[in-house]
Amino acid sequence: MVTYAEVEIFLYECHSLKDKRSILKRIKNRLQKDLNIALSELDFQDLWQRTKFGIVTVSESAEIGDQIIQQALELIDFFTEVERTVTNVEIR
């Protein structure tokens, strides 16, 4: 099963695209290291206080895939300098 989430994030402490890249790199590295998922920035590359991630995992069941995505969302929430604003999850 493939589980996919689109996550829009507001970055409070960013004052430039360089700050944004630094924070996103930390989040991306942590998610990939801890959960072994794939993710990419999908939108708002030119805005320094907003971004949209796509997060994908492949698992043997929908339940496991959903658990992994939920763990990823909790991990994103752990970063105090960002706020998740919109989240959509799909299981296929």
What residue spans do the PLM features occupy?
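C-terminal binding/interaction regions
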Residues: 20
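Short, charge-patterned binding micro-sites
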Residues: 2, 40-61
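C-terminal structural segments of small proteins and small subunits
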Residues: 57-92
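A generic structural motif
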Residues: 11-16, 59-61
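Short glycine-/aliphatic-rich beta-strand segments at the starts of folded cytosolic domains
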Residues: 3-13
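A short linear hydrophobic-aromatic micro-motif
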Residues: 37-43, 84-87
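Absolute protein N-terminus
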Residues: 1-2, 92
